[in-house]
Amino acid sequence: MDEQKTGTLYIVATPIGNSRDMSPRGVQILTDVDIIAAEDTRRSMVLLGKLEIRNKLMSNHKFNEYGKAKYFINEMKAGKSVAVITDAGTPCISDPGNELIRAAVENGIRVVGVPGCCAAVNALSISGFDLSSFLFYGFFPRETADRRRVLMMMRKGDTATYAFYESPKRIMSVIDFFIEENAQLRLCLCN
């Protein structure tokens, strides 16, 4: 009896605003895989529709990724390939996907990254700041005590450039926080 070959888990970056930024390799992989695991299937259907991709689309978001990981692992053990995509940018960069990758590695399933857009790297590249050393922190904390802890870390004399994500709804509260704390920072805000 032949041993069944396992599928592959692809981590595919998606555009961060312009669907024409999707790489040809990313399009090919999304076309070829058996299942696309998407952060938000409604938003992903828009991109996939523009790219004329009609593969099986399933949700994989922060509220279900632990439960769905087992399902996707079983599918890959049965020989199917799965691609993880996020609403915009690279999966696992402040988006779901880490749990599935961890489970894939633990189960000996091959994981392949398909590079493309990453909002943090794109913003850093146009900031004009020294990028010989930078730290991506994810989303800026919401609570004042946590914000102060992060600001203290930044003030310790480290010369690294810090990059944070923030929602448009909260950006002004972050700027107000820096002003109130007399942070004396150079800021680059990107959308």
Task: Cite the ranges covered by each PLM segment.
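Short active-site oxyanion
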Residues: 30-36, 108-112, 161-162
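Short glycine-rich anion-binding loops that position phosphate/pyrophosphate groups of nucleotides
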Residues: 16-18, 87-91, 168-170
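Conserved helicase motor
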Residues: 59-66, 139-144
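Beta-strand/loop-alpha-helix module characteristic of Rossmann-like adenine-cofactor folds
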Residues: 2, 6-7, 118-191
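Short phosphate-binding loop-to-helix
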Residues: 62-77, 96
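Alpha-helix capping/helix-boundary segments
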Residues: 42-44, 89-90, 119, 170
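Glycine-rich, flexible N-terminal cofactor/catalytic loop recognition
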Residues: 1-63
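Short glycine-cluster motifs
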Residues: 77-141
